[in-house]
């Protein structure tokens, strides 16, 4: 490949990254649901004409590492012409779990015509012009159908989890496909909110496409595409350099999920990380078979988790492009917890199993890089959904949230308290926004003081969040680290286990399993005490 100018490369890194970031801002500011506009449960990225990622926003790792497989599936199954938008969420066709819906659009020189709710006639010539880029966004919809509000319950197959959307056109030539939209909305709760969020995603794609066309117009198509290629190659070289600095060898580790909510049995995840020169192989052979409950991860999730771990080892100035994964091979045997076969239920694979994969790979690498790898963070997203009829309006509501916990202690610093870590990068819904949007009241929200694992550097403390329901509702929870604590490293203590309770209106208290659904009455409270991070090094 031709040589490049380092200064110009950095300019393009910033340009393409700013496109993805601005897409995220547009999505956040125009979305309707608190889960997107307040919690920022979305991600945006820019791809080249082959579907290779060029740049990502600083969004959700679990989305970003798996989104390339969604784009690949869309390109394999459909033709995305000018003004088209393809949607998908099918975990077995490039998706991850059903609430995360990905929208993808092409960018063709000289036109863009996706405007939500407005018809645009595309010039026929544009339909034959070559695609320059693709833009994609993924957002977690607070309900996508299924047996329980929030679509995060304990289904035993994917059919019970909600609406599966294979790669399909949601917009053609700038016009929303009303039949497709109606079909989706007929099968979800709070359909007006879902529709508004889909339209916000479409608008985000328009923003990204317009910005990319401005770059091409300002700097020229040839140079813009050449430097997209340079960004990918540069990322690959930097990742190979990072891997080459790890001592050659084979490093093994095991961790486990508590259970799948059905069998009560621990679910082991085993990994062998083999480093040879400037390449890495991450092999999950020996991990648990897929399970009946909703903790199964599809291959895209496992690749995403591995991508995140190795991304943490590379400097932040290295472009987050497809090149990062070129020197890394991931072996995830089909039919296991890390690469489940259809029709496995997968709601928790995205949010819980991804965290345990990260914990396990970091644990293996800690044997090779003892001075760089942190202790385990809380290792769960504490997924909480509450839904029913809002007594204030008589309309359906569906509340979804992940609750922060403790970060693992670092080799030179304490872990941070009450924060989202690893595969999530979201926020907790502000109490004011939560109470305005839902028939819920935040009774307590604080740091779980003293819960972090002790050590030379202390693990971050977990959080306490207590929410009262103001009317009858169904609550579901998918969480973990209730039986096996987040590990400490180098002599540091483990973090505290998480726990959750229902406090009934009469004052009685029921401790909850980590996974399940429960009926709530007006005045009942849900209390979650999240796990803390492990400590690093011996105290004193």
Predicted segment positions?
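Glycine/proline-enriched, intrinsically flexible loops and inter-domain linkers
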Residues: 1-97, 101-110, 130-281, 285-540
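Short, basic, low-complexity termini and linkers enriched in Ser/Thr/Gly/Pro
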Residues: 109-131
